[in-house]
Amino acid sequence: MPSDILVVAALGRPFTLGALYDARKDKLYPGFTLWEHEVLEESTVESDQPSSTFEITASDSIDDKSSLMDIEASLKASFLGGLIEVGGSAKYLNDTKKFKNQSRVTLQYKATTSFKQLMTNLETKHVEYSEYFQNIEATHVVIGILYGANAFFVFDSDKVDSSNVQDIQGSMEAVIKKIPSVEISGQGSVQLTSEESDITNSFSCKFHGDFHLPSNPTTFEDAVKTYQQLPQMMGKETAVPMTVWLVPMTNFYSEAPQLMADSSTPILRKVRNTLEAMRQLDMRCNDSLERRHSEAGFHCLKKKLKTFQKHYERLHVNPFRKNHFPETFSPSGKGTKMKLQCLPTFRNKLRSPSNINSLNMWMDCAEREINVLRSCIDIIEEAKHKVVLSKSQMARELDDSEVKHAVCYVFTYVTDYDPFLNALSDFSKSIKPKKYSPSKKDYWYTSDDVPEMMREKAHHFYNLAKDMENRCVRFLVASIVNPKEEGAAIHYYREGIQIINDFSNPRIPPVETIQDQESYSGMTVSSPWKETAHPALHLSEGNKKAMSGKPQPSDNNPKRFDHYQQVLCNKGLSKRHYWEVEWCGYVRAGITYKGIQRKTFASECSLGHTDMSWVFDYYPKSGYHHIYNNKKVRVKVASPGFDRLGVYLDWPAGTLSFYMVTSTWVTHLHTFSIRFNEAVYPAFLIGHGQKNANGQIKLKGE
């Protein structure tokens, strides 16, 4: 009779001496034994075997995890096939990294306490045979158990840039190696250097162990305290089976089934390699799903990624679970090694659309698509745009009564349709599915021309948006499938109606010819800046209104005008802006650089008297003028004149224009052509103290 002893890892299973075990399925039959309880107790020999070790690993592979837990090849195959349910510290086997761009370091504490074995001369003595032996497919009997406990502290960093993974992992390993020797102060806190604290604050901790803890550690400091308590918690009464020795059942019962030679190594290697590749694929998919998906286009990609994940889990991972394919891991006949039965199923997987090469190729394409869209979104990130995720949301934006113009950057090729995903779905449902492998020709983003064109349009959209300060113009980003428009387009809407499919440069009419005030509607500027206001200027109505009067006490603020009754707005302008001024009395309105002098009667302090400011003025006795660099030019206006001045700044084009405003119509008065070299500020002179002239302005267009 064969008398080979088999050694297996317990993996949290409730082994007892004399228990029956089917090594072909790695199935334990708890509660069944060949001997009476009294015989087992009389035949048990126990010896102390105290030991403790710790080990650190940065690997997350199933092979290295199995090595830490002393799991041999056949048992590993059963675990991969889902035949055994692990418990206690063995749950560490199921704990895998979620992201590729994540550092992981694991600390193992392992202790043993005692070894129990049955006397070897038991053989058939006192064996209690019964009919149930004919129904139990046990191949072995437990004759020895090593007791102890395992503890795994799994430290994970946050998701980081791929270039930093190795550096962070090295830093983590260095500080985790110190855990057995880290000192704890009298106050119970862990003593670390500031650099070590910075490192440990960036990662979390998970615990898998055979110890009963009040609460599991979640931080590095918790882990240190728990680790140092483990030796005191270890005792014979708390120890669990760690390693089990078994002898063939045929030693006691000749009709028992036998375990034949294990020839499953080739298929085991294939299964292991494929499942490891699937784990890597899952992390890549999680990395992509974790990225921001609020932007237009990305919600379609998220939907495709989730569908992809669902299909490969069903087609590639679940087939190795007995609940889905019980015949895969059932014995093909008495005495044979059943794990070989999964070979045909596994070969079918390698020939199917769900083979790992095809899955990785699809994931390469998905990552490429994400990167192309991300590059476009990054370009327009700083533009004041709004993402539109549905047709109804688009309609709401366009129907907004305040919006007269809308410019929309549209991803035209982003869709949730995918031929490869359809093939995966077909394969899972059909008896004779079609063969299919993803081809780069199926995907637009694998070319160079289309992504480059999309980025060019993204730059153009950004330039349009960044130069516009107009509440009546809205910039949107959306995904609208249209194969006729390659990759991306810029749509222009006017009052909710699409006017242009591929909007390039907006046609800005010459400033001298504009007559409709609506051309400028919605462009805004900020209110006058109280800190700059001359003491004789009184601001009201949220600083929108300013009038001259009796000087008030004021501080000696260096920003304040001390001599000329002037005030600036508080925000510099460097885009396109329009504002209106209701005025009366002695008034000037225009723009200036921030560096205008504030504390002197000299001409460089007065608006329009240097090359730093451009203004239009009104004085009841002399009429209207435009002034620049101390050159004052009269502008003829028909009687009775006007009390509302429109000012249009086109900073990018280098123009400043003034208009007479009546109702909704404007009449061009004058345009300065200027080469701006910095932001400019709306500025006003209101009244003149020496001339005993008062003035008043009220700012519109805010």
UniProtKB/Swiss-Prot annotation:
Which Gene Ontology molecular-function terms are recorded?
toxin activity
Which residue ranges does the record annotate as region Structural FAT domain?
Answer: 265-387
Pfam families under this entry? MACPF_SNTX, PRY, SPRY, Stonustoxin_helical, Thioredoxin_11
Q: Which UniProt keywords apply?
A: Cytolysis, Disulfide bond, Glycoprotein, Hemolysis, Myotoxin, Neurotoxin, Secreted, Toxin
Q: What does the entry report about post-translational modification of this chain?
A: Intrachain disulfide bonds may be present in the heterodimer.
Q: Which residue numbers delimit the B30.2/SPRY domain?
A: 504-702
Q: Which SUPFAM superfamilies match?
A: Concanavalin A-like lectins/glucanases
Transmembrane ranges? none
Chief localization class?
secreted
Task: State the coiled-coil residue ranges.
Answer: none
Q: Which InterPro entries match?
A: B30.2/SPRY (IPR001870), B30.2/SPRY_sf (IPR043136), ConA-like_dom_sf (IPR013320), Cytolytic_pore-forming_toxin (IPR052090), PRY (IPR006574), SNTX_MACPF/CDC-like_dom (IPR056072), SPRY_dom (IPR003877), Stonustoxin-like_helical (IPR048997)
- How does this polypeptide assemble, per the annotation? Heterodimer of alpha and beta subunits; non-covalently linked. Also associates into tetramers or even higher aggregates.
UniProt function note: This heterodimer induces potent hemolytic activities (when tested on rabbit erythrocytes, EC(50)=25-56 ng/mL) due to its ability to form pores in the cell membrane. The pore may be composed of 10 alpha/beta heterodimers. The toxin shows cardiovascular effects that include a vasorelaxant action that may involve the L-arginine-nitric oxid synthase pathway. In addition, it displays edema-inducing activities, increases vascular permeability. It also shows myotoxic activities and interferes irreversibly with neuromuscular function.
What is this protein's record name? Cytolytic toxin-beta
Q: Which organism is it from?
A: Scorpaena plumieri
